[in-house]
Design a protein with these regions (language model features):
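N-terminal helix-turn-helix DNA-binding core of bacterial DNA-binding proteins
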Residues: 25-59
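C-terminal regulatory/oligomerization modules of transcriptional regulators
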Residues: 4-8, 121-148
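Canonical helix-turn-helix DNA-binding module
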Residues: 50-81
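Basic, amphipathic "hinge/linker" alpha-helix immediately C-terminal to the N-terminal HTH DNA-binding motif
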Residues: 83-101
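Short, positively charged and aromatic/hydrophobic N-terminal segments
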Residues: 11-14, 18-21
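Arg/Lys-rich, alpha-helical DNA-contact motif
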Residues: 97-132
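Residues within the alpha-helical elements of helix-turn-helix
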Residues: 56, 94, 111
Length: 148
């Protein structure tokens, strides 16, 4: 692990309260979490139910109902005739971006010696605050140095 990579993580693990840009539009961290969880559930099970989103995120069903209403109104999700949640293209793009960040940051933190559960939790926090430019640089650095 190079010193440069370690410096990135020391810097970004302390970043909080900065403005985030995802796909050149602002979106709240909670919305990113919901979209990412929906993508993960779709990959795991082939479908996404509100109750499963609640279980995955550790939130109440009414919280999921409120969030899905807002996400639907914003054009990120819809519901199929069976009531399953379907990610629309804008929501899928955000979910994939967050999930990619989460996986890469988790792997890098583990390579730095962070315990796996802590690495996952920290990656979840970092993924939301990292600019596109900074994440692209970290990803490029990791690939060039075969750190992931």
């Amino acid at each position: 692990m190079t010193n440069l990579c370690l410096c990135f993580f020391l810097l970004f693990s302390r970043v909080s309260g900065i403005f985030r840009t995802v796909m050149k539009m602002n979106i709240h961290k909670s919305a990113e979490d919901y979209l990412e969880a929906m993508l993960m559930l779709k990959e795991e099970r082939g479908y996404v139910r509100s109750i499963d989103v609640a279980d995955k995120l550790g939130v109440t069903k009414p919280s999921v109902s409120y969030a899905t209403k807002r996400l639907r109104e914003s054009g990120y999700i819809t519901f199929d005739p069976a009531g399953m949640i379907v990610l629309l293209e804008p929501g899928l793009e955000i979910a994939e971006r967050m999930y990619e960040r989460h996986k890469l940051l988790t792997r890098l933190l583990i390579r730095l010696g962070v315990e796996a559960e802590t690495a996952r939790e920290d990656a979840c926090r970092i993924e939301h605050d990292l600019s596109v430019e900074s994440f692209d640089a970290i990803r490029r650095h990791a690939r060039e140095h075969r750190e992931v």
